[in-house]
C-alpha cells in the first residue's frame, strides 16, 4: 500500500512539474528553429536584442509575417551596440513591416545586452546569441527555450518595464538579471551575486566556456577555488592579446594559478557558461566583466542536472566536445609555420602565420572589400583585400588574378565563419609561373 501511495505522489509531482526547457546550440541548430518558433505566434511577440545585422533579414521577414497574421510585435533594440549604431537597414525593414520598434533609453543601462523573446505570453527564448550571420553560422552560442510559466512571466514583465524605461524590483527574481545594483531602494538584478555564489560554492569542479574574462572579483574567486582544490577548466577562443584584451590576459593569469586552459579555434566562443560540480550551470548573456554584471541589462538562468536534465546534459556534452577539440596553446603566440602548405590545410593553422599556395578559382569585388578565392564553394579559404591597397596589385584588380597560381603569406583568421588571410602589401602575394 505504501508503495502505491509513493508511486501516486510521484505521478502527481510529475503532473505539476515545471515544463522542461530546451537548449538550442549554435552553430549546430541554425536559424530555422527560431523562424519556426516565430511562426507559431498568434497574439504577441516581445523581442529584445543587442545586435541585429542585415544578414538576418529572414528573422525580419518572419516578424513581418506575424504582423500580417494580426500579431502585436514589439522590438526593443540597443541604441549603440559595441559603441556603434544599429543597422538602419534592419530598422527600416522592421518598421516597413509594421513592427513597433524602440531603441533603448539613453543612460538607463550601459548596454541592453539581453537577447530574449516572449511569444504569446506562453514561451520564451533567451541566451547568448544575437541576430547576426555569425551567431547561427560561426559562433558557439547557447539559447534556452522554455514554457515554464514563472520564467516566461518574469521575462515579459522586465521587457515591459524596459520598454517604458521604468525600474523594476527584481529582488525576488527566479532568473539571473543584470544590472546587479540597488538604485533608490530598488534591487535591479542579482547577476554578480549568482556568478560569485556558483564559483565560491563549487567543491570539486568548475567548467567555464566564456567569451570574456576581465572581472577582477570573478578572476580572484576562480583563483581561490583552485587554491582550495577545485579542478577548474576554462575554454575560450584564441586571439592576439595585443589586439584583444577581453579574454586572453585574464585566461592566461588563471592558467598560472592552476586553471586548465584551452583555446577553441572554431566555432568562435561567444558563450557565457559556468558549470559547478557537474550538476549546476549558469547560461545566458552575462559576460565575466564589471559592466556586464553591474551596468548592462543581461539575462541568464540556472540549470541543474536534477531539475532540467535535458537542457543541462546537452550543454555539458557540447562543452566536453569543445574541450576535446580545443588546444592548450594560443596559436596567435606561436611562431610562423615553416615551409609552404596547400591552401586546403589553412584552417588547421588558425591564428598562425603561414604561407599557402594554390590557384585562384574565383574573384569577387564588393563595396569596401575584394576576395581572391581558391575554390568556388561558398566556404572556401580566401585572401582579403581592402580598397586602400587595390592600386598596388596587378590590374585590373582583382580580375587579373583569376586562374593564376599564387603563394600568399599572412595570419589565418576567421570572419563570420570564413577562414581567410588579409593581404595588406604586395610583399605578401607572389604570382607563380
Question: Across the structure, where does each feature detected by a protein language model lie?
Answer:
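Charged, low-complexity intrinsically disordered terminal segments
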Residues: 14-104, 108-338, 353-356
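Non-membrane alpha-helical secondary structure
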Residues: 1-4, 338
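OB-fold single-stranded nucleic acid-binding module
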Residues: 334-433
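Sec-dependent N-terminal signal peptides
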Residues: 3-14
